[in-house]
Amino acid sequence: MLFFDKNKRILKRYSKIVEKINQLDQSMRKKSNEEIVSLSSELKERVNSLEDADRNLVEAFALVREAARRTLGMRPFDVQVMGGIALHEGKVAEMKTGEGKTLAATMPVYLNALIGKGVHVVTVNDYLARRDALWMGPVYLLLGLRVGVINSLGKSYEVVWKDPSLVEKAIKENWSVWPQEFDGEILKEEQMNKEALNAFQVELKEISRKEAYMCDVTYGTNNEFGFDYLRDNLVLDYNDKVQRGHFYAIVDEADSVLIDEARTPLIISGPSKESPSTYRRFAQIAKKFVKDKDFTIDEKARTVILTEEGVAKAEKIIGVDNLYEPGNVSLLYHLINALKALHLFKKDVDYVVMNGEVIIVDEFTGRLLPGRRYSGGLHQAIEAKEGVPIKEESITYATITFQNYFRMYEKLAGMTGTAKTEENEFVQVYGMEVVVIPTHRPMIRKDHDDLVFRTQKEKYEKIVEEIEKRYKKGQPVLVGTTSIEKSELLSSMLKKKGIPHQVLNAKHHEKEAEIVAKAGQKGMVTIATNMAGRGTDIKLGPGVAELGGLCVIGTERHESRRIDNQLRGRAGRQGDPGESIFFLSLEDDLLRIFGGEQIGKVMKILKIEEGQPIQHPMLSKLIENIQKKVEGINFSIRKSLMEMDEVLDKQRSTIYSLRDQILLEKDYDEYLKQIFEDVIGTRVEEFCSGKNWDLEGLKNSLSFLPRDLFEFDGRRFESSEELYEYLFNRMWEEYQKKRQEIGEEYSKVIRFLMLRIIDEHWRRYLEEVEHVREAVQLRAYGQKDPIVEFKKETYLMFDEMMRRINDTIANYVLRVVKVTEKDEKEAKEELGKIRLVHEEFNLVNRAMRRAMEKGKKKGGSHGLGKIRVKR
């Protein structure tokens, strides 16, 4: 009850704002087109912040309403204006199917776009992004805003006037799609001013991705906005970034994107280009290395460290001058992995070999983990060691969940037909209240109580009977199934009965919208998986309202009431008649797992015969309570995963901020000074802070740096501070020497090296984190809190990674030397490989790669043609 009281209070406040907007209606109608354009320019001058937007809401909303009337022949209803206010306030607007969410969004989109930081309108597929941008484009264009569209094929567009000179004429001569004399609520197509409608036509013009984001409004899918963010944080030049920040987003189908897919990680990955022969080659090379002479083993960290002798041996065997050259980094990793496979990972302890496959053994339970693989090329190294077929390695370069991506926005809003049941989660995770917007016309759909059968066989037979009955009288039927498999089963049963029907599975393509739109025609039977066709209205064909409207049949209850409500909501749009009914069985997953035995007992007591259902409001209530219980369980799972993700999110921000700092910096002296201080300071503190100094241990701990850097030559130091000063000055002198030696290219080289080092360490860290995430879940059995354990481990791991990044940067910048002109060609070839590898970072999948291949510009040189790194 409290929810509805609160909702009523919010709607009462909105009604007062709508009244003020309505009061401006007549004055807006009297304005000429030129005055409308001019008022929009004035508002743009006035609105520079969110506070300014709040102050100018009434005038801006009234202006958009008038622009929509003139360009589209559509006037947002009062309830749509209410929805727009909720969206402007950063809430989730629950608006039923067919209530015009797309038009409602134009008002808050326009108002917030005036601030000039860019507004993102997020849809669930490319088709809807393109459709909505073209459909609403004329409103924004008349008001002087630029509209961009991005899609998953790497293409980007701007919405532009089809005939700018005709638009100019239409503005000058005051053309309007909505005739001045028409005072009705809804303008029918035949009543529209065709001359104006023709003038205000728009089309798409291809532009760059960056330009699409520079537009005032950008339409796109949740996937693409997320992927562009990840790709932006893999660039080697700041100017290659396409997004300009995360200011305000309106998410369509918010429940689907922000809750159902909240934990879905967006992953930029690519198959490794390594051939199996590389792994086999290094498996052989590793056998030639002698433990404690060529390498040492750190059992605790489960890693291998090459000695100076080992590095020299590797360079000789592999046939390279310098193992530390940027282009040779992968060779070093191959060697380390081969040595780890040979000396650290034991057959029948860490893994077993079965049917030509290397299968990991769970270290906690001793069980086999088929399908699970070691990351970073280690699994392939073990396969090479064991002589079994080597499977392709997949490399993760960057990842983020939708939850964490959308929480970056300064202001976030959502709209959907079903959100009320998830308000608790919207509030706790995103800080967004849900406002239920009333329908423009009263809802008259008839929702029947659930029918429960003993078996699935009985249930499906009755569903087919029900479909046949309604098909014979011409009433359209939409059947919602929970899986593709179930939709195909039902389809084959209907074929046997000779009932024509269309099947729609949840694979988004443009044809889907056509199928869904046809579902309301007389005699049409459509089978669809629950999520298919969201965003497209089912309009009733001629004579269908008299037959009772669209009949929606649910074939089982979903774990979430919201998904069931979405299915019901396909019928009864905009006050149309309609029906909904769910057919269930005790064998359905939900009832079988969560309490179907209670219903089974009732059926036995009532002596329900085979093929006969049980139907009662109390039963529907019982099923709803089961769903509430499951929703609670699922929410708590998502919440605990979110707490783990928050740790990773902060770490991601740290890494991406560090990248930005490096990309924007022109001189790296100050940054490198901090790194040297850290590298020297931590070692001096560890080995020489007390009375017992371990100078040999100190030298060994710095052995990854050039060897001749720290020769003490019998020097004595009075304090650890003096020792620190000496070591730091030696490093700094060496750095300055290198800097002068290389000259003006040095900064460019250092930037490239540092970014590569950070990206590589972060990539490997992400893989390690996934292993920790899996491992801590098992510790719950030992009465340990997985979240506390995860936080503890990842904090330590992150600190360790940052230390390794600093060590590696110090190592590389002190080894850079200028190469002679004769080596230039060879060095450029190495660079070509690096650049291609980095381009791989920017690609999501093969299809996208092919689409981008044609128009791809050649990447410019990173200025590394004359550089190599020397040991």
UniProtKB/Swiss-Prot annotation:
Which subcellular locations apply to this protein? Cell inner membrane; Cytoplasm
Record's protein name: Protein translocase subunit SecA
Give start-end positions of Basic residues composition bias.
855-871
Q: How does it sit in the membrane?
A: Peripheral membrane protein
Quaternary structure, from the entry? Monomer and homodimer. Part of the essential Sec protein translocation apparatus which comprises SecA, SecYEG and auxiliary proteins SecDF. Other proteins may also be involved.
Give the EC number(s) listed in the UniProt record: 7.4.2.8
Which purpose does this protein serve, as stated in its record?
Part of the Sec protein translocase complex. Interacts with the SecYEG preprotein conducting channel. Has a central role in coupling the hydrolysis of ATP to the transfer of proteins into and across the cell membrane, serving as an ATP-driven molecular motor driving the stepwise translocation of polypeptide chains across the membrane.
* Keyword list, A-Z: ATP-binding, Cell inner membrane, Cell membrane, Cytoplasm, Membrane, Nucleotide-binding, Protein transport, Translocase, Translocation, Transport
